Amino acid sequence: MTALTGRPVVYCGVCSLPPEYCEYGGTVKKCQQWLEKNQPTMYSRIWSPEVLEAEMASLSVEAQERAMKDAKKKAAKAEAAEQKQADKRANSVVTIKRIERNKRKYVTSVSGLEAFGLELKKVAKDFGKKFATGSSVTKVPSGGEEIVVQGDVSGEIEEFILEKYKEVPEDNIELVEDKKKKKGEGN
């Protein structure tokens, strides 16, 4: 009896679906570009003008009009979402805050990384490995999350973020020093 082998399936590098299903996602244009670059034979099988014309010819006139309308609507929606994401990234700020805990003890808080598509748990683990300290993801009362690293490593964290995570621009990183109020300073 011969052993059964699985059929190799190609997955899109953009949306992670098989290329035949990319048209149902929101990133059709990017998926087409990726497929044309990485799998030209499959691209010609799915997206060549002849294939598209043949598919359109098999539809009724009303269905063709509806398909064109839907395609335009999807493209506009995807473009708007992409623009919104780019604006969000451009306007978001990564705040690295040095907070005094006790007399000479500090913790460093990093917030705003999630806007750049980074997984906070992985980044926290990287910080812990890099600086040989404890680091964790904590929830902030305002609703977001931040990474808290033990020790005064704010300058090093800024350099590490710029070096390892290229998607975070240098202009969007802000260093803040937070001092604990002395007992006499209060109300």
Swiss-Prot record:
Q: Which GO terms describe its biological process?
A: formation of translation preinitiation complex; nuclear-transcribed mRNA catabolic process, nonsense-mediated decay; ribosome disassembly; translation reinitiation
Q: Which cysteines are joined by disulfide bonds?
A: none
**Which positions carry the signal peptide feature in this UniProt record?**
none
Which is a Pfam family this sequence falls into?
A: SUI1
The alphabetized UniProt keywords are: Cytoplasm
PROSITE patterns assigned to the protein according to its UniProt record, in alphabetical order: SUI1 (PS50296)
Chief location of this protein within or outside the cell: cytoplasm
Q: Which GO terms describe its molecular function?
A: translation initiation factor activity
Gene3D superfamilies documented for this protein: SUI1-like domain (3.30.780.10)
One cellular component GO annotation, for this chain's record?
A: cytoplasm
**Highest taxon of the source?**
Eukaryota
Q: Which residues form the SUI1 domain?
A: 94-165
Q: Where in the cell is it found?
A: Cytoplasm
Give the record's subunit note. Interacts with the 40S ribosomal subunit.
Q: What is known of its domains?
A: The SUI1 domain may be involved in RNA binding.
Q: Which family does it belong to?
A: Belongs to the DENR family.
Q: What is this protein called?
A: Translation machinery-associated protein 22
Source organism (scientific name): Neurospora crassa (strain ATCC 24698 / 74-OR23-1A / CBS 708.71 / DSM 1257 / FGSC 987)
Per the record, the gene is: tma-22
